[in-house]
């Protein structure tokens, strides 16, 4: 079945793009969508506690956002801007480089105050090796900026270092926050535990490809970027137990969805460590996830395709139209949906 990328477009008034977070994480709004009936209802995010039951399992992505934006220069003094994509060893890393003229392979360039050698280039991605004493972790710690999404159209500010990070972030490696998790305050996490709802953590390091628009007309011919994930054995055990006892597996964010569905591709959830380029679009089956919390996604993005695969495209577009009419806030610092 031929699916056009344009079918996943919608018109969003620019003022509904949330450039700043709310004062309190859990003060955002929550649109509840029943994927069977299409019924839509408006709530506060803190009401989520009433939609989950003892015996349910919430699966969070514990990846931590790197201070991945760095600056530097060529030895000539020409300015460079870096977006660190993936760290291979403390002194070897893949990065995007914004420059008037691309640095040549074999050349030496400065990352902040430290010299690095350009070992290789693949498309827009450079492989750099640090020549000085500092490693990339030290450089990020000393000079790094939170890499806010391009649509926020602003430089990062001090509060972003805390607010563009989930309260349970642990494993450093993402270029963008797993944003559905940003709504969970420490108090709400405690309430969830107190209610007897189980919690598990997977890791998916979000790559910058998450912001890449789909550039082909035919959805199925889009090639997904690869991201590193880890679905540990104890998470698989919890999922099997939850299913056996009649509970629901509720994924917090599309990164958790993609991780769990990668690990469950054969119909049975198995531990998984490695890369995933899973692409979930209408017609694809979900083997693990029963419900999800997710933010509102960019038009024509792979993520609006994912939620359309889960809940049916017409229902999603209708929910988005409702959210626009009700002035919900969109994208990373915006409001959320609970699709069940």
Swiss-Prot record:
It is found in: Cytoplasm. The keyword Zinc does not apply. It comes from the Bacteria. Its main location: cytoplasm. One of its GO terms (molecular function) is S-adenosylmethionine:tRNA ribosyltransferase-isomerase activity. One of its GO terms (cellular component) is cytoplasm. GO terms for biological process: queuosine biosynthetic process; tRNA wobble guanine modification. It catalyses: 7-aminomethyl-7-carbaguanosine(34) in tRNA + S-adenosyl-L-methionine = epoxyqueuosine(34) in tRNA + adenine + L-methionine + 2 H(+). Monomer. Transfers and isomerizes the ribose moiety from AdoMet to the 7-aminomethyl group of 7-deazaguanine (preQ1-tRNA) to give epoxyqueuosine (oQ-tRNA). This is S-adenosylmethionine:tRNA ribosyltransferase-isomerase. It comes from Francisella tularensis subsp. tularensis (strain SCHU S4 / Schu 4).
């Amino acid at each position: 079945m031929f699916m056009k990328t344009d079918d996943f477009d919608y018109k969003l008034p620019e003022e509904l793009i949330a450039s700043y977070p709310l004062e309190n994480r859990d003060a955002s709004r929550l649109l509840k969508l029943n994927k069977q009936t299409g019924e839509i209802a408006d709530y506060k995010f803190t009401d989520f506690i009433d939609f989950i039951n003892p015996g349910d399992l919430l699966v969070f992505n514990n990846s931590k956002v790197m201070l991945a934006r760095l600056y530097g220069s060529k030895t000539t003094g020409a300015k460079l801007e870096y977006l660190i994509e993936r760290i291979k060893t403390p002194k070897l890393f893949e990065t995007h480089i914004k420059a008037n003229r691309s640095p040549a392979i074999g050349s030496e360039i400065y990352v902040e105050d430290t010299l690095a050698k350009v070992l290789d280039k693949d498309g827009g991605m450079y492989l750099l090796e640090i020549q000085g004493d500092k490693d990339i972790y030290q450089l990020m710690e000393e000079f790094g900026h939170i890499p806010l999404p391009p649509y926020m159209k602003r430089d990062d500010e001090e509060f972003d270092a805390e607010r563009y990070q989930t309260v349970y972030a642990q494993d450093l490696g993402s270029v963008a926050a797993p944003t559905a998790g940003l709504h969970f305050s420490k108090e709400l996490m405690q309430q969830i535990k107190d209610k007897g709802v189980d919690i598990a953590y997977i890791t998916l390091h979000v790559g910058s490809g998450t912001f890449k628009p789909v550039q082909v007309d035919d959805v199925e011919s889009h090639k997904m970027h690869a991201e590193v994930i880890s679905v540990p054995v104890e998470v698989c055990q919890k999922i099997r137990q939850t299913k056996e006892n009649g509970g629901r597996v509720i994924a917090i964010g599309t990164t958790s969805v993609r991780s769990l569905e990668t690990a469950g591709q054969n119909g049975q959830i198995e531990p998984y460590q490695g890369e995933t380029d899973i692409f979930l679009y209408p017609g694809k089956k979900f083997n693990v996830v029963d419900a999800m919390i997710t933010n509102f996604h960019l038009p024509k993005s792979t993520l609006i395709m994912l939620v359309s695969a889960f809940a049916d495209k017409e229902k999603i577009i209708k929910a988005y139209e409702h959210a626009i009419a009700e002035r919900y806030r969109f994208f990373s610092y915006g409001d959320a949906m609970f699709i069940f």
